Design a protein with these regions (language model features):
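A short C-terminal boundary segment appended to hydrolase-like catalytic domains
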Residues: 51-125
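Conserved beta-sheet core of the metallophosphoesterase superfamily
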Residues: 1-58
Length: 125
């Protein structure tokens, strides 16, 4: 998945939003472009479990410059509730999960994720 997402950037994509495993995964900046490896499911039918990680349903909005370089973004955290659909996560668990996965899986991914969901590039020193 990581190789494919980077292949997409290498071949002209400005943003990659991955999907598939029904759970959130890490995010990263690669060559000044934003990659979200998976945002889980936003609205799941009754046949699929929405317990725990399977219920996390973030929406990530990103801003780029005219050349497609990532400027900043925001995670809008939602959690699915059976029979009710997605509801805003007021506990912070969704943002914390994405930050933890990003720190663990891609060593921070060149991004800083704040508690309020703001996503900014780590300044190069």
């Amino acid at each position: 998945l990581r190789r494919f997402a980077r292949f997409c950037i290498d071949n002209g994509a400005d943003i990659v939003y991955g999907h598939g495993p029904h759970v959130v995964r890490c995010v990263e900046m690669y060559k000044d472009r934003f990659i979200a490896y998976s945002l889980g499911n936003f609205c799941t039918p009754y046949a699929i479990s929405i317990m725990g990680l399977s219920g996390y349903a973030p929406v990530i909005v990103v801003r780029t410059d005219r050349r497609g370089r990532f400027l900043d973004g925001r995670i809008h955290p939602f959690i699915q509730r059976k029979g009710l659909g997605p509801r805003r996560d007021t506990t912070g668990v969704v943002v914390r999960q994405i930050r933890m996965l990003t720190d663990t899986d891609v060593n921070g991914g060149g991004l800083r994720i704040s508690d309020d969901g703001a996503v900014v590039p780590v300044e190069k020193e």
